[in-house]
Amino acid sequence: MKKYTQADFDAFEVIDGIKQCPSGDYSDIQIFGERCSFGKWCSFGEWCSFGKGCSFGECCSFGKCCSFGRACSFGRACSFGE
């Protein structure tokens, strides 16, 4: 699984106001803005923060104490705080 840095994340393409984020390991990044769309099997570290309107593919995993803005959506089999 590709591990992304903040610089990688900042460079991702934005289409119709939505940042397109491929599948991968985002555990080194803690703060994500609004309207990000993540692929399947993404992995996030502890204490990460997501703005409103983010969407996550199937089987994404989130560390402890992550926070989510309103209207975020999650694919099936996502796990939280594990």
Residue spans of the language-model regions?
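Extended, small-residue-rich solenoid/repeat segments and analogous flexible loops
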Residues: 1-40
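Thr-biased low-complexity repeat/linker tracts and other Thr-enriched repetitive architectures
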Residues: 34-82
